Amino acid sequence: MDYLTMFYDGWRDLMDNKSDPRTRDYPLMSSPFPTIAISLTYAYIVKVLGPKLMENRKPFELRKVLIVYNAAQVIFSAWLFYESCIGGWLNGYNLRCEPVNYSYSPKAIRTAEGCWWYYFSKFTEFFDTFFFVMRKRYDQVSTLHVIHHGIMPVSVWWGVKFTPGGHSTFFGFLNTFVHIFMYAYYMLAAMGPKVQKYLWWKKYLTVMQMIQFVLVMVHSFQLFFKNDCNYPIGFAYFIGAHAVMFYFLFSNFYKRAYVKRDGKDKASVKANGHANGHVKALKDGDVAPTSNGQANGFHNTFSKFTTDMCNPALNSSTRQRVLVNAGNK
């Protein structure tokens, strides 16, 4: 019991006295457990309950809903990116090391509120997966997708609770920028085949994500060598570790989705081109161009041979001479 009491007292001290008092009364900020529960519920719905409910149902037609939803996410992401720019990253923040401003100045409060709205945006992104399930696009509900969406609210919660501003908000600054393009792509893709043919740049969204994680790694891990601004180093470890994990998850996805597939497609095109040439030749009664001369020569010789051998005017000695000549050819 003593250990449990010590743990509880330490936990309450961490939540009540060590956290940022400015965000303490924000929605869902009193404890991490509601956020954890919501994230676990999300994972259960998209991997278990949702597919079960859709098992005997036809996929929903959500084209118009998807266009509106993704347009709203583009606007939301653009606003969050703007707030992160005004809050610091294009307005005085130092890329080398930036402390958290715990004051109640308008700029500091605006940054803290922007961090909370970024946290809230991670819940709105759950609808990406809900719509996949409703459309029975289960191939899109990958482990990478669910891990990425399920972990983010919990991860961001700690940042809003203890460090709503400063160095680690660089992650949100980049992430909202990438999401502008990502949701713009989804919005355009939902408009149908007439627009989809112009979306050749899909794979570069994944490249942008990976570049984002590399930049976050470099930005976070630099504090291990020199922490001039006394930023809480634990959060640098935390953000950097997330960036490493997500980088490898997205890198593996990119290799499976594009590198290996492109290799298979090239091999398939090469094989099909070779095979289709022969299939067409057989179907049309022709032969491959490289053997046409030999085949046509054989065809002419064989025709002359059969004509001569069947000619009743030829005597036996002449037939024998024709047979010998054909054998020599």
From Swiss-Prot:
Location within or outside the cell: Membrane
GO biological process: fatty acid elongation; fatty acid elongation, monounsaturated fatty acid; fatty acid elongation, polyunsaturated fatty acid; fatty acid elongation, saturated fatty acid; long-chain fatty acid metabolic process; sphingolipid biosynthetic process; very long-chain fatty acid biosynthetic process
InterPro entries reported in the protein's UniProt record: ELO_fam
This enzyme's EC code(s): 2.3.1.199
Transmembrane stretches, start-end: 26-46, 66-86, 114-134, 146-166, 170-190, 205-225, 233-253
Enzyme class of the recorded protein, top EC level: transferase
An example Gene Ontology molecular-function term: fatty acid elongase activity
Keywords in alphabetical order: Fatty acid biosynthesis, Fatty acid metabolism, Lipid biosynthesis, Lipid metabolism, Membrane, Transferase, Transmembrane, Transmembrane helix
Catalytic activity: a very-long-chain acyl-CoA + malonyl-CoA + H(+) = a very-long-chain 3-oxoacyl-CoA + CO2 + CoA
Cellular compartments per GO CC: endoplasmic reticulum membrane
Its membrane topology: Multi-pass membrane protein
The keyword Transferase is annotated on this UniProt entry: yes
Pfam family, one: ELO
Job of this protein: Catalyzes the first and rate-limiting reaction of the four reactions that constitute the long-chain fatty acids elongation cycle. This endoplasmic reticulum-bound enzymatic process allows the addition of 2 carbons to the chain of long- and very long-chain fatty acids (VLCFAs) per cycle.
Family, as annotated: Belongs to the ELO family.
Protein name: Very long chain fatty acid elongase 7
